[in-house]
Amino acid sequence: MKFVSTRGSAPEKTFSEALLTGLADDGVLYVPDVWPSLEISGDGDYLETAFEVMSLFTAESLDQVTFKKIIDEAYKSFDVQEIVPLIELDEQIFLMELFHGPTLAFKDIALQLVGGLFDYELNSRGEHLTIVGATSGDTGSAAIEACKGRQNLDIVILHPSNRVSEVQRRQMTTVDSFNVHNVAIEGTFDDCQDLVKAMFNDLEYRKKLKLGAVNSINWARVMAQIVYYVVASERLGSHDKPVIFSVPTGNFGNVFAGHAARNCGLNIPKLLVASNKNDILTQFFNSAEMKIDEVVPTLSPSMDIQISSNLERFIFELFERDGEKVRNLFEKFRLEGNVKVDSDIKAKFSNSWAGYSFDDEEVVKCISSQAESSGIILDPHSAVGILAARSHRDKQIDPEIPIVSLATAHPAKFPKAVERALGHCPPLPDRLADLHERPEFFTQLPNDLEVVKDHVISCSRINEK
């Protein structure tokens, strides 16, 4: 298997090459040249399923005995044996908890694996990588946790100043490691993401620092997330049984992993895109139109995004892998801030996708009512997913098909939202009990590409190698 660019103007790569480069040479995203077929007959054991699924993408590039060891090691730090518990909330509505990793967010599932893969590949090659990433809250801490203390890696994470929760920020900025560098950017997450993309698009700079990516622009992230869709289906009967998934999403990586699972043969008749008031994705899946607007701060800040990087992977599929058409659409979108796909394109996804969006008041009510009815406390992003699942079920669409809603973060990561709903803050796990007393280490920078590039150079140890 090879990996190809969504614009079609960059060389094909092996899995290992795509892992280390992150973005293609033409500045965009990798996808598999063909979708493999799932042949899974497991019982929902996470580690076994993870190896079976991901070996479809890695077998030609990685020694599989070694890869199995990397998988087993990646999930040792999770708090529960099943890795992703599945809980029935209502009749035929389930919650899959993805937040039992070291930083309490679903990003740990992919990034604990990616950190191990980076380490293996770089040690094998005797190379060094400078990781640069942007975060709307959870990716940063998960990436830092996965990469801290690794001799062949430096990691620089950009987050939007004052636009992540305090717990999210402190999980990043209290890490004191020689290879970890946090930067607060005076702007939005979209600004942070644009800075990262601009650095990758400067090929001379990229090669000089040997830049690597941990955001979901890196295919390995998406690959690792396919696994829990398969696991959910297995635990509900088999991977042939139809299951609808409700996915709170901002950057489209998590829900695209569900689409990838479907492309590999998993029976997912519909994916529900769950958004907050920053509902550009909901607009697209309901009307086939995208229109950039101002980012509105909400109680679910990880979804306060207007430009969703991973949507390009989906558009590439819609346009039957015509890179030129993809390029033209996104260039128009960047220039005009508005784009609509034709009716024949919309027809390709209108029956298999649906979009829902909710405001903060609805989210607060959901957290409150769920805690009262079941004792389960949802974080605001997971509440958006549950709201979408119930809204879909209320329409009596596919009533016999189970809906799995993905719980993406521990409620303690968003204490203000939970306190507003319940009148008290959820406690942090014991290992993070002193988080608010730990010293912070970060640099404040303007939204200025040259300033940020110079700072990344100062952080990288590449010249010491």
Q: What does each of the following model-derived ranges do?
A:
Residues M1-K465:
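PLP-dependent amino-acid enzyme catalytic core
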